[in-house]
Curated annotation (Swiss-Prot):
Identification of the protein by name: Uridylate kinase
EC number(s) reported in the record: 2.7.4.22
Keyword NAD assigned: no
Subunit-structure text: Homohexamer.
Binding residues annotated for UMP, in chain numbering: G60, D80, T141, G142, N143, P144, F145, F146, T147, T148
Regulation of its function: Inhibited by UTP.
Record flagged with keyword Secreted: no
Protein species of origin: Pseudomonas putida (strain ATCC 47054 / DSM 6125 / CFBP 8728 / NCIMB 11950 / KT2440)
Annotated pathway: Pyrimidine metabolism; CTP biosynthesis via de novo pathway; UDP from UMP (UMPK route): step 1/1
Main location: cytoplasm
Gene: pyrH
A GO biological process held by the record: 'de novo' CTP biosynthetic process
């Protein structure tokens, strides 16, 4: 059952949470770590418990990397289609974890997969969100050459989410890779144009421009920090906030 969290009022009514496929690997070298799935399902359940509507987009990098095989000679479109299928596999695994916790969930795919997932339908997705179901958007945008980050921003705009929350391995956006540069400094707040001008690599250009053009706030945070997701949703200042206006 969705866990009830008392005494904390959500700042956002509807969010779009973007998880990388790599996040699902946990301590494994490949695939899906069931312990990570269960932990993420618990954190999402906490949000549902306080009345937050949750849309999810999960990458596929834990199962397939189209870009790497494309560099080795595979046709890019074929590689991207295979990557889309990987995101469907991750979506099904996440749905299973949520339902085992008695959290109703629905997987929608941008590629028609009758009998496996529902086909993506914006109006149907919004109806399910309004009913308290977690909606998992898979297969990216359904088109090659678009990343799952772009898909996350697109779906967030389509379902009229209040914010895109991008879960990463670090607690925000830095001036450089903090794993490689010990002097890298973290930003608490950035504008879309600053991200583009500084080439910070938060998301690809298409995703950032989508957010900028539709004034969709984006927050980057560390999913491995316990309670970070809930803290953001109730108004905490985790990670880095990217939005329009002055930094």
């Amino acid at each position: 059952m969705a866990q009830q969290v008392s005494g904390r009022q959500p700042r956002y009514k509807r969010i779009l949470l973007k998880l990388s496929g790599e996040a699902l690997m946990g301590s494994e070298d490949f695939g899906i770590d069931p312990k990570v799935l269960d932990r993420m399902a618990l954190e999402v359940g906490q949000l549902v418990g306080i009345g937050v509507q949750v849309g999810l987009v999960i990458g596929g990098g834990n199962l397939f990397r189209g870009a790497a095989l494309s560099a080795a000679g595979m046709d890019r479109v074929t590689g991207d289609h295979m990557g889309m299928l990987a995101t469907v596999m991750n979506g099904l695994a996440m749905r299973d974890a949520l339902e085992r916790s008695n959290i109703p969930a629905l997987v929608m795919s941008a590629i028609s997969m009758v009998g496996v997932t529902d086909h993506y339908d914006r109006r149907k997705a919004i109806r399910h969100l309004n009913s308290g179901d977690v909606v998992i958007f898979s297969a990216g945008t359904g088109n090659p050459f678009f990343t799952t980050d772009s898909a996350a921003c697109l779906r967030a705009i389509e379902i009229d989410a209040d914010v895109v929350l991008k879960a990463t391995k670090v607690d925000g956006v830095y001036t450089a890779d903090p794993f490689k540069d010990p002097h890298a400094e973290k930003f608490d707040h950035l504008t879309y144009d600053e991200v583009l001008d500084r080439k910070l690599g938060v998301m690809d250009l298409t995703a950032i421009c989508l957010c900028r053009d539709h004034k969709m706030p984006l927050r980057v945070f560390n999913m491995n920090k316990p309670g970070a997701l809930l803290n953001i949703v109730v108004g905490g200042a985790e990670g880095t906030l990217i939005e329009e206006g002055q930094a």
